[in-house]
Amino acid sequence: MAAENKEIPVVSIVGKSDTGKTTLIEKIIPELTGRGYRVATIKHDVHGFEIDHKGKDSWRHKKAGASTTILSSPRQVAVVEDVEKDHEIAELRDKYIRNVDIILTEGFKKSRHPKIEVFRADLEGNIIFRNDEKLTAVVGDKPPDVNVPCFNRNDVNGIVDLIEARFLR
């Protein structure tokens, strides 16, 4: 089912820290793949990250000055590339992602892509993206007063039904 010559749809899972964004994505992925879709994810980390391990050969390549290092095995490929700016989702999609039907992102709060906000009433007073025209749904423990579909965080089938209807057909 992988998208070939059309733009791959992107859905951003957004919300404040500790609301369950990663947990929701972990539940959505197997439901989508179980329905036959291929899924890519992009996680934004404002704090930076280290994918490599000190002392490993690829780490030593980077430490020696390589601007790009590719780790390749029979089962996976990883690219570690120095960048001078934060990349937009479209740039990452166009450069690194192919042969998938949908991209789920986490942490790209400023993106112009459709958003599903994860909400916890005990952590937040208000929905962050209430007035964002790209807000597609809210997932949480207590339905807020918004003009988009609201789902309980355990209603993975309902959430994926919405994603499938809006972005995959």
Located regions from the model:
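N-terminal phosphate/diphosphate-binding loop that engages ATP/GTP or pyrophosphate donors
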Residues: 27-84
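Phosphate/Mg2+-binding loops and adjacent switch elements
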Residues: 102-169
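Phosphate-binding/switch loop-helix module in NTP-utilizing enzymes
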Residues: 81-110
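Conserved beta-strand scaffold positions in the cores of enzyme catalytic domains, especially
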Residues: 10, 41, 69-71, 115, ...
